């Protein structure tokens, strides 16, 4: 599974598929945080894990929201859903959403229950911020441990 926050160019998508070689099962996703907020009847926001199908390969996923097990919403504002804008691959929407939800809880540098973005996007943004502060001419470290 490959996550991006920008749309796939046709040549880029072809390159990723070519790079797969013999790997048959793949999913390439474009994820965007939607600015629209949704409400549900009652006083709690939508449930974490709620999926709204917009099309066969386009859907909304609430990665933040009310968690019945804890009987609370671990956030401060009305949650915004994550929109799966593009989905190129073999998995069902349910499988993709389940995996994204799991990846929102995979930040070992935080004690939070989960985050709005999967670690694949969140960590890439974190490293990107660090790299923008590097002086010109310095070769960046390639090992993960330098960015924890």
Feature names for model-found ranges:
Residues 1-148:
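Long, contiguous domain-sized segments
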